[in-house]
């Protein structure tokens, strides 16, 4: 059913013929027949992107709703604990340069948002089976160019803002360089992760929710503090 729905969506068809093993026409599938499949598929992907691992309805029991939501909430909590560990590793740097702590939310939020944007586009492409239409190399190159442009714009803006507000050139360079690196890495992860999941037969919509957000939060923190440690030790 899902394969038929994808074909009808891709080619904008109103009906698809049905033939038997001998190639004889035995009927047809219309858009009215397939609309429920499309709706169900969209709902399933929306729930996965929200971190709900099983198909649930609002009139289900409290325990059923809780079981569907808890797994990714627990994973998010574990991610938060790991983020605390990463921060603790660089606590000495934070004590010396207190301003570093002020930009942790900015780095984490930007990485998460960029990753979700990239993964959502890939998941949408995979849904209609055209993610590889132009070849994986061309897609990754386009992602890289977009990330370079967005990273450059955001880095210039944040550099000017930090310099204007805090009058600290070293801090401005640190935040700007880290933000640029985070945008590049988050874009790459957001693009590659759904493709890898799809290749292993796992619904790629998983990569558009808490998974990619948590992963990019950790990645962003590690990059940010590594850049800060490197620049301030020079």
Map each language-model feature to its residues.
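Non-transmembrane, extramembrane segments of multi-pass ion/lipid transporters
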Residues: 33-66, 117-140, 195-201
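Cytosolic regulatory modules rich in charged/polar residues
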Residues: 1-102
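Hydrophobic alpha-helical scaffolding
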Residues: 56, 72, 112, 182-183
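Hydrophobic side chains within alpha-helical segments
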Residues: 36, 72, 120, 219-220
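Hydrophobic, small-residue-rich transmembrane alpha-helices and their short perimembrane loops
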Residues: 86, 100-117
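Hydrophobic alpha-helical transmembrane segments of multi-pass small-molecule transporters/permeases
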Residues: 69, 89, 103-109, 175-180
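Generic detector of multi-pass transmembrane helix bundles and their immediately adjacent loops
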Residues: 78, 84, 89-93, 97, ...
